[in-house]
Amino acid sequence: PKQVGLLWVRPGVTLKANIFGGGQELGLRSGTENVAGVVGFATALELAQKRRSAEVKRLRKLREELVKDLKQAFPEMLISSDMKKSLVSFLNISFSGIDAERLVFLLESRGVLVATGSACAANSGTRSHVLASIGLSEAEIDGSLRLTLGKLNNDENIKRAGEFIIEAVRAEMKRTRR
């Protein structure tokens, strides 16, 4: 639900009030509580918890299939994270020497939404310090694509996304004569 959320505060952390008034929320944010929103949020959390295991399994399978297809086409493709320890909904891949910004444009024209670099450096106009810190070269950072999988993804659209990524990377390799 809109206008409701959860803030988990570590013991020992002191927060300052940002809205003053009636003293609701332990004096940290006064105003009438959105009871219906809170109940809706609690229900959403319960549903997410019940579905989490199956969703993790589903997303892991989709990500593994996508990686398998891409690796088959590009054995030199770099995966920038430990596939066993990273979030199953997240994938950062790199095609050294390819301009990932051009890939983003080509893929968006086909309905595949991806981003470049790391989320920590998004829209900063500089190379990702996160990818540099894990040892990627400038060419690998410049060729990095970030993909996020979610509840709307399925076998069919992940397969098509993989095909479009392969086409786009091949087109860029041909353009740059690699």
Task: List each model region and its residues.
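PLP-dependent enzyme catalytic core of the Aspartate aminotransferase-like
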Residues: 122, 126-178
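Active-site PLP attachment segment
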Residues: 1-26, 30-43
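A glycine- and small/hydrophobic-rich beta-loop-beta segment
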Residues: 74-76
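Short beta-strand-to-loop capping motifs
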Residues: 9, 93-97, 149-151
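Conserved C-terminal alpha-helix-loop-beta "cap" of PLP-dependent enzymes
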Residues: 89-145
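A general structural signal for well-ordered alpha-helical segments in protein cores
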Residues: 1, 35-38, 45, 63, ...
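Structural signature of PLP-dependent enzymes
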Residues: 45-68, 78-87, 99
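Thr-Gly-centered strand-to-loop micro-motif
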Residues: 2, 28, 81, 93-94, ...
